[in-house]
Amino acid sequence: YLSSLIDDHSRFILHSEFYDNKSASVVEDSFHKAILQFGKFDCGYTDNGKEYISTQLVKSCARLGIRLLRAKPRKGESKGKIEKFHRVVDRFIEEIRIAKVHTLEELNRLWKIFLDQDYQKEPHGGIRKYYESMDVSVPDGGISPLQEWNRDSRELIFIDTGVVGEAFMHHEDRTIDAAGCFSFDGFMYEASTSLAGAKVRIAYDPLDTSVITVNYQGMEPIRAKRVAISAHAQKKPPVPAAMTDTIPETSRFLDALEKRYNEENRMAADAISFGSYRKKEAAAHV
C-alpha cells in the first residue's frame, strides 16, 4: 500500500512510502514524516476513506494547527492531482517488475531514488497549464515540481520534533499487574513494581511499539520495554506478490537513476567537505 502527500500547487511530493498494510496509522505516519521534513502546512485535503478520517489523525493535525478537509464521495475530479501522480507510480511498478526486489525496505529505497531523480525533476504538464491559463510564459524546458516548490517565497514553518512526535502519539489506559507489567497488543511490557495495581496512561507510536511510555501522576514517565515475544510476531514483510511475479536480475532504468542519485550525493558531500576545508584554511591565515 502506497501513502503519499503532494503539495497542491507545485505537485512536489512531500512524502511517499510503501507500507505492508492499509491502516489509519500508515496515513498518520506519512503526515508525521512530511511535517518533520518540510514543516507545517495550513490545510490538508484527503480522501474520505476510513483510514483518512480517523479521529486520531484529526486530533494530531489539530494539535499542530493543521486543518483537515475531506473530498466528497464520488468526486474524483477533486483528487485529480494525486490521481495523475499515481500514473507515475504505475511506471515505477513496471520497472520494479523487472528488478529483483524482495523486501519492503529495498522497494522504498528504489522508490525514493525514482522520485528524487525522475518525477521531482521532470517538467510537469500541470504546472505549465496552470501558468498558461493565466497568460504567463513558461520556459521551453518546462517547470519541474522541485523547481516550482523552490520558487515559492513563503517561509517554511518547522515545529520542534518532540512536539510533532507527541502530537501523533496514541494514548490508552492500562492497569499494572503485581509483577509491574502490563499487556499491549499481545505483548508484555515491564513498567515498575512500584506501580502494581495502578491505572496508568500509556503513550505509543503505532508503527513502533518496541518501547511504550508509561505516565502516572506524581512520577516521571517510564519507558517500558517489551519483555516477551508473542507467537504471532513476524519478520519484515515481503514485497506484495503482485509486484514480483516476474523477477529478472535488474532494471536498467532504476540502475541509471540510482547511479545518478549516488553521484549527486557524492558531489554534495564533496562540496560540504571543501567548504569546511576553506573555512579552516582561512582561519589558519588570520
What residue ranges belong to the model's regions?
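Protein C-terminal end segments and domain termini
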Residues: 174-286
